[in-house]
Structure formats: structure tokens, C-alpha cells
Amino acid sequence: MKSKKQARAACPCGGGELAACCGRYLGPDASPAPTAQALMRSRYSAYALGLEDYLLATWHPSTRPEALHLDEDAGVVKWIGLEVKRCEAGSERDAEGVVEFVARCKVGGKAERMHETSRFLREDGRWYYVSGLVA
């Protein structure tokens, strides 16, 4: 059972409390993210929390790497903010979606930004990350 402090922890994506935001998609028995944007936000949160299993499970099999090695980034990369710039399609009724975002982080204490346009596919009621174009 989670403590009150854990239940009220802020979601890394900036969408409110973790439990009410991305936390509802991150567990092994959790519901799938209903939209491409919700999946993108939950994947950002998973990166921030070091949840490699979730990231791999939500990566489309056609482009999924074997591993991400997030443990190598632990203590070096700190994710500090997310801004969604644009969404195209990606609703519960769509089969494809695009989400453009800017993710801010610190790498070894130095501030950096990653501006990406990500492509998502929905198959069998689940959204998957397919690929991203970094600007």
C-alpha cells in the first residue's frame, strides 16, 4: 500500500498528482493510456522514474530496442519538465497519432532540451510509441 506522501507525489509530466495522472497507466496491471498524448506523457514519466519495463512494453514491436539501459543514466539525467506543443489525431477513435513536445532535463547538472515529434499507433485498443524525430 502506498503512503499518503507517495499517493500525493507530483507527476513528472506536470499533470497533477502521480496517482491521478500517469500513475494509473504505469503499473503492470494498469489500464492502457487512452490517447497518444496520454501515452507520451506516461512514457516521459516512466523515463523520469526509471521504469524501463513500461517503456519497452509501450514501444511498438516493429521499432522496439532490446533494452534501454536506464540504470546507466541514473544519477546523471534528471528530467525536470515537459511541454506538449501539438497533437494530431491520437484520440480513442484514431489508429495513428502524432505528439510534438519539448522535454527538459539536466545531464550532469547541465540544462538541456529535447524537442521531438513522436509517432504513435493504436493496435488492439493499445497505443504504442513507434518513432520520433528530434528537432
Swiss-Prot record:
SUPFAM superfamilies: NTF2-like. Transmembrane segments: none annotated. It comes from the Bacteria. Pfam families: YchJ_M-like (PF17775). InterPro entries: NTF2-like_dom_sf (IPR032710), UPF0225 (IPR023006), YchJ-like_M (IPR048469). Belongs to the UPF0225 family. This is UPF0225 protein CV_3559. It comes from Chromobacterium violaceum (strain ATCC 12472 / DSM 30191 / JCM 1249 / CCUG 213 / NBRC 12614 / NCIMB 9131 / NCTC 9757 / MK).
